[in-house]
Every structure is written in C-alpha cells, then in structure tokens.
Swiss-Prot record:
Substrates-to-products reaction catalysed: a 5'-end NAD(+)-phospho-ribonucleoside in mRNA + H2O = a 5'-end phospho-ribonucleoside in mRNA + NAD(+) + H(+); a 5'-end (N(7)-methyl 5'-triphosphoguanosine)-ribonucleoside-ribonucleotide in mRNA + H2O = a (N(7)-methyl 5'-triphosphoguanosine)-nucleoside + a 5'-end phospho-ribonucleoside in mRNA + H(+); a 5'-end triphospho-ribonucleoside in mRNA + H2O = a 5'-end phospho-ribonucleoside in mRNA + diphosphate + H(+)
The protein's name in its UniProt record: Decapping nuclease RAI1
Record's keyword terms, sorted: Exonuclease, Hydrolase, Metal-binding, mRNA processing, Nuclease, Nucleotide-binding, Nucleus, RNA-binding
Species assigned in the record: Eremothecium gossypii (strain ATCC 10895 / CBS 109.51 / FGSC 9923 / NRRL Y-1056) (Yeast)
Pfam families listed in its UniProt record: RAI1
Amino acid sequence: MVFESELLLQRRLATTALKQPKELGYYSTNVGGELKVMDESNLSYYYLPDADIEKHIDLSAGARKFQDEQAEAEDDTGSLHGLLQTLMEYERRKSKKVNADIIAFRGQVKRLIHCAFGGHATDVDMYVMSFDGQLFIRAARKKLEFPTSPRESWAYLAYYSGYKFERMALLDRPVAETPREVLESRGKQVVRNGPQYKTVVRTGVGEHKLVLGAEVDGIFDFREPTGDNLKHYVELKVAKKVQTLKDATNFEQKLFSVWLQCFLVGINRVIIGFRDEKFVLKSVEEFSTSEIPLLLKSTGLRNACVDAIKWYGALTKWLCELPRGPEDDFKLYRLSCSRGALHLRQLHDEDLANGDDIIPGWFREWRRSLSKSHGS
C-alpha cells in the first residue's frame, strides 16, 4: 500500500512561535563543483556611496558579455552536498548529531510557503527523504530554469539587472582593503554569477526545528571572524521605480517575497535599488526585515506576513508527521502542489533512495559512525 497525504493550502497553525535563527556554518562554492566548507572566500562586502548612485548607473550595461555561469554549467543546482558537508563539519565539532527535524535549502521552504500566497504550484516539485530520524528535502529538478530569450530582450535585461546591481554594490574585499582602481572600474567589469557564498542556519517554528542552507549576497558592515554573522548579512534586490498603481502592487508583492526570503534565515537588512523603464538606477533604499510587515499593514497584504508564519507552522507540522524510522530505514516521498493542496506520495525507487542525489553515501557513513561512537 502506497502512503499518501495532503495538506490544504488554507490550513493554518494557531501559533506563530518562532525560534531565533542561529548560524551553524558557511561555505563557498563555484561552478564545476568546487566547494570549501567554513571558507569565506566568496563572501562580498556592500559598498555603494551616494556619489555612485547619483551617476545613474545603467543596470543593462554589459548584458551581452554577461558570464551566466549558473545557466551554462552542468551542475546539479538542487544538490544538498554543500549543505551536508557543512553540517557534517558542525557535527564533528560538536561530537553529536544536529538537533533538527527538517534539513533543506531556504529556496524549497520558501516555495512551499509561497504556493499558498499566489506562487506557482509547479514550483513545488521536491523529494523528501526520511533518514536517521530527520527529513531531507531537495528539488526534484537538477537544473534551475534560466531565461532563454535574446540578451537584448526586456525579459533578459530584467534578469541581468539584478546581477549588475550586485556587481556595482558589492566588493570582493572590505572597502578599506580594496585598491582605488578597483573601486573606480566596477562599472567596466564583466558580470558573472558563478561564485557563491552560503550560510547554514538552524531555525524553527512551533515545536519543530529546521536546518536551512541559503545563499548570502554580502556583508553590510563588517564580518566577525569567530561569531554568528547573520546580523551582518544583507540581501540585495532591484525593483522598478513606483509610479503607477500597478507598480505599487508589484512592489508590495516583491516586499513580501523578500521578507519571506530573509525572515526564514534571520537576515535583518534588505537594500533595494529602484530602476526606471530603461534599467537606469534612480535611487537606493534600505529596509529592515522586521519592519516590512508594518509597511505592508496599509496594503492589500496587510495580514500576509502573520498568515505566512501560521502556514509555515502548519506545513512544517504536517511534514514532521511523516514516519521517521531509525538510521537505515529510508523512506522516500514526492512532494507536489495541485488542486489547492500540498501532496505527499511515497515512492519505491531503490536507485534514487540508495543513490547520492539526495543523501550521499559519505554522509550516511558519517551518521553511522557518529551513532556508533555514541553507542559505544
């Protein structure tokens, strides 16, 4: 008999109790599979003075030379390997298994929440594996979808402008360590999106704990070499300058989306660059993640943030009701969204369950050795 379960999208948990996110580790990754745990070499630093903003930066400049390494690479963009390597290093330091119910990337959890607030149902297509008393979630697709339109098209320039803004607003090193010629030539540098820096955070809602991996755009002020840097991270976004009612509605939706993205892992600061129809940067504004729900109070999304937390609690509780057996009791499920509900269906795919696509062999062996060391 095949196990199946569903959760209606209008379901909500009464509680909005949240656990304070805490950084467990971080890693740097490049296209091609290069990955360095507890390494900040790909961490960037925010620096965009008013004098630069006043130059009306063209966020479409250089699109033809854009090195879209993520789109061109053959990498498995849904792989949990970097997250699990960082988690393994954390467990090695602590000599114990991390206390968590769900392990996933922020992007997957965001999709699960967003599907109840106008997100595309097709965005929810995931595998859930029960292993060692925990649930591991990854995207079913190994490759993200990237724009296929011509580089001079509006759709492609809208996609590119976000990366261009990051290139103009971020430095590879703190500004005090950056040569003047580098600062002055940022506008001429070719934009590329291969190198990434990711944080691994433990958080929770209601009675359940999650470990989430998430890409970080950069540091806003300074980095603490031995501390938790969540309070120093910043998220960058580009939005169209608000001039019409439609612009305002779109911006409110974007604010809700970025709040959800940052709230999930405890990033406290958002910087949004406002552009015109020709992708010229007109202004830059800083937002506190905690203040965004207050800003949305006077809009059509007045209750969206609290409602999202209640839905987050409901879906997490539902997932954690899945049977979670001992170390070698693997159970595999497909998670999807359709007809106003989330659906879980058990799979009997031994190749997928025993392969490295979801939980690699080296992580399974690590957990076995950890279990034996505690049992001896």
